[in-house]
A protein has these predicted regions:
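Bacterial N-terminal signal peptides
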Residues: 16-28
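Sequence context surrounding c-type heme c attachment/ligation sites in exported
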Residues: 201, 208-328, 332, 675
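Primarily short, surface-exposed interaction patches in extracytoplasmic proteins
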Residues: 64-101, 106, 110-141, 156-209, ...
Length: 793
């Protein structure tokens, strides 16, 4: 443990090693250094890799003689061309009930109302489907659905993960920013710029008050705060964790925006892609003013972090200045009081007590060691010293409880310190709203240095801000321009402009691939976060480039790409033979893993791929069908709690517990059990593509969870209320709500028998002996537990 010039305690990892190990390590390092000094030709040869070439709009193929089906837009032409190479063709369009259910879940994440289905089926106008697409795109719930996808890409969570998984109050503002951005169809280049450098777009420090738009722009930089942060709750500043947090902010953002994995480049130049270790640290240098290891801001207040934090209060300028002064003072006081309680007071009284009773230790060596350690000043003791002293506490009755009883002076001092801490807490209980943002901490940051083997204790030469040479547009080098009249470096703003340059080869390709993936279940590139040499090849390379060019040429409009995909004949195909086609294609074409991914994705275009709803959509659909869903938009997250049986659920005390799942507090270690059963991630990192498992726990969760049973009962009450007195009408209403269709005759007969077995009553078509609520609850429970409810065709 060391102290720097400012007196801040820092932890180092240096240990004394045996001489032989030191010698062997030195030889290994010397050998590896010589090996790394020889430049590899591999990265240079890969500058011709497909994804590193500028996007050029390809010619739409003429496939009029290759397919009997109508082509609705260029997407269909590209897909038909690839299918023809595999001896396949597109399949017919799905029926209207299937299309509206598919479209509703795709765009807003909820099942359609039966009245919406009936209206769409009855609409004979030629543009009925296109009108439906526009209506769903205009829904405020569209932003909730598609924000959830982006939050996966960003790795959004409202806690730190480490050391108690400390909560980040107010971080929900970033989530709300993303929802609003999707609803407004904010141009993607602007969306990227605000998330990387929203704080550099205006002089927020000088602003007298913040407009709602400015609050959103600052909240957007929460994108860089999404990765886990081990520095949020440290008692001492551990440089290893500081650097890890800084590196994660850069790595996750570049993976999300450029689709390149860069973790390995911390330690050495990329073995496959044209990314040098020097370039990695040039990117780090762009983030250095905001994430400066020598001038670190904690993410939250804690006993270990008493000073200012990485957050901006939503107050006018005088209020912000007063808030900073006041919080700095009371945090420092609280920190000192905690130190007194946990360190000074407790340790001094403990040491006094143990010295007085040390003779009770029978082991002579242990007694001598204890007396020697107690004679040291506490500041001179090592962690191992304190660990040994603590091991004797119980035996000598030096616990805090025992000390309070034995020494009234200690108890009084302890009570006074605790009383003052509680008074501070009450004085500051009503903190102003906070924006958990990213911003430059200093106008003169410490120099960024290349770290040998990624070790912060082995800094090499300093590096200037820069980007990847293999991706830079020719004739337009990366340049950081100082923002006039601003206390910001302008580095992240320059990075955003480099990424959104029309000639950048990756940004548009990566995003349109993500959009395709969320519409079809698999991207045109099966590895959405790895467009490098080791990633998958695009199944439809010309289609990918055409979409990327179309994206940029139409103002980076995400909804424009939605319209193209959703209105295509490719997306509107039926799905009943898709699985068979994919199996045949895999058997014929897949000779290795890469080809298998290519075959599956290509064949998926010969029929829509049936797939299971995500965890959040399942929960939301259960609430919607039951008539329980609270559709309130935006605001604070729903708290979760750990139950005595080990499960995690939304707090039963929450008055808004029936809101959509995107509003559930995303603590990394306490994801609701129902959601984890259906593959909701814990966000230990970002999740560009979720797992899609089929496990027994999923069926058990729907059969036995109190939430599913509650929804089933409310669903049954809704059916009884809206379905009329006749069994067939009620069952029809239940099917319409759950499946967006009417039951077949054999299904009516099956559920009649099922209902009678639960209600012990025969059912007449006239409704003379209607089933009980218990029977209808069982019927509704069966519908909600079925594959047809969980899957979209």
């Amino acid at each position: 443990v060391q102290a720097d010039a400012s007196g801040q305690v820092r932890c180092c990892r240096k240990v004394i090693l045996p001489l032989a190990f030191v010698i062997l390590s030195s030889l290994a390092i010397a050998h590896s250094s010589r090996a790394e000094a020889v430049p590899s030709s591999t990265p240079h040869s890969l500058k011709g890799h497909w994804s590193f070439q500028p996007v050029r709009r390809p010619t739409v193929p003429d496939v009029s003689r290759l397919t009997p089906h109508a082509l609705r837009n260029p997407i269909d032409a590209f897909v038909a061309s690839e299918l023809a190479k595999q001896g396949l063709s597109a399949v017919p369009e799905a029926d209207r009930q299937t299309l509206i259910r598919r479209l509703s879940f795709d765009l807003i994440g909820l099942p359609p109302e039966p009245e919406e289905v009936e209206q769409f089926i009855a609409d004979l106008k030629s543009d009925a489907y296109e009108t439906l697409v526009e209506r769903f795109l205009a829904s405020p719930h569209y932003g909730e659905r598609w924000a959830r996808h982006w939050l996966d890409v960003a790795g959004f969570a409202e806690s730190s993960m480490f050391i108690g998984d400390a909560v980040r109050p107010g971080f929900w503002r970033y989530r709300d920013y993303v929802i609003r951005a999707f609803n407004a169809d904010k141009p993607y280049n602007q969306f990227v710029t605000e998330q990387l450098a929203g704080d550099e777009l205006f002089d927020w420090r000088s602003a007298h008050t913040f407009t709602p738009e400015q609050i959103d722009t600052l909240a957007a930089t929460g994108f860089l705060r999404c990765p886990p942060d081990a520095t949020d709750n440290q008692l001492i500043t551990q440089f290893e964790k500081v650097y890890a947090t800084q590196q994660a902010a850069m790595e996750v953002s570049m993976k999300a925006l450029m689709g390149l994995t860069m973790n390995c480049v911390r330690c050495h130049s990329h073995k496959y892609d044209p990314i040098s270790q020097d370039e990695y640290y040039k990117l780090i240098a762009i983030f250095q003013p905001a994430y400066d290891p020598e001038n670190w801001l904690a993410g939250i207040w804690s006993a270990g972090n008493p000073g200012p934090i990485r957050a901006i209060p939503v107050l006018d300028r005088p209020g912000r200045e007063e808030y900073e002064r006041r919080t700095r003072n009371w945090q420092a006081e609280r920190h000192n009081l905690n130190e007194q309680i946990n360190g000074g007071l407790l340790r001094s009284w403990r040491d006094r007590h143990m010295k007085a009773r040390a003779e009770e230790i029978r082991d002579d060596a242990a007694r001598a060691k204890l007396m020697s350690l107690l004679s040291k000043a506490s500041a001179e003791r090592t962690p191992d010293d304190e660990k040994f002293i603590d091991s004797q506490v119980e035996a000598l009755g030096a616990t805090q409880t025992a000390l309070e009883k034995a020494y009234p002076g200690f108890a009084g001092a302890l009570a006074a310190a605790r009383t003052r801490i509680e008074a501070i807490r009450k004085e500051n209980a009503n903190l102003p709203p906070l924006i958990w943002a990213t911003f430059d901490v200093s106008t003169n940051p410490s120099p960024a240095r290349l770290l040998h083997r990624g070790d912060y204790e082995q800094p090499a030469h300093s590096v200037e801000p820069g980007v990847l040479r293999a991706l830079g547009p020719s004739g337009d080098p990366f340049h950081v321009a100082k923002v006039p009249h601003s206390r910001t470096s302008g580095g992240r703003l320059a990075l955003a402009r480099w990424l959104t340059n029309r000639e950048h080869p990756l940004t548009a390709r990566v995003m349109v691939n993500r959009l395709w993936q969320y519409h079809f279940g698999m991207g045109l590139v099966a590895t959405p976060d790895d467009f490098g040499e080791r990633g998958a090849r695009p199944t439809h390379p010309e289609l990918l480039d055409w979409l990327a060019a179309e994206f940029m040429d139409n103002g980076w409009s995400i909804k424009h790409i939605h319209r193209l995909i959703l209105n295509s004949a490719t997306w509107r195909q039926t799905s009943f033979i898709a699985a068979t086609v994919r199996r045949e294609a895999d058997a014929n074409l897949a000779s290795d893993d890469t080809t298998a991914a290519h075959a599956s994705t290509g064949a998926a275009a010969a029929g829509f791929p049936s797939r299971r709803l995500e965890a959040e959509a399942i929960r939301d659909a259960l609430l919607e069908v039951a008539g329980l869903l609270d559709r309130q938009l935006f605001g604070e997250s729903l708290p979760t709690q750990r139950l005595p049986d080990g499960r995690t659920d939304i707090s039963t005390n929450s008055t808004t517990r029936l809101r959509r799942s995107i509003y559930i507090s995303t603590r990394r270690t306490t994801v609701p059990t129902l959601l984890t059963a259906f593959d909701a991630p814990s966000m230990d990192t970002n999740w560009p593509k979720r797992n899609d498992s089929v496990i027994p726990q999923q069926a058990l969760a729907l059969m036995n969870s109190s939430f599913a049973l509650e929804c089933s009962e409310h669903f049954a009450r809704r059916v009884l209320r809206e379905g009329g007195p006749i069994f067939e009408k009620r069952l029809g209403r239940a099917f319409a709500l759950a499946y967006a269709r009417q039951p077949e005759p054999d299904e009516v007969a099956l559920f009649k028998k099922f209902g009678e077995s639960h209600g012990n009553a025969a059912i007449s078509s006239g409704g003379d002996k209607p089933l009980t609520l218990e029977s209808w609850t069982a019927i509704c429970h069966a519908l909600l537990s079925s594959n047809e409810f969980l899957y979209v065709d």
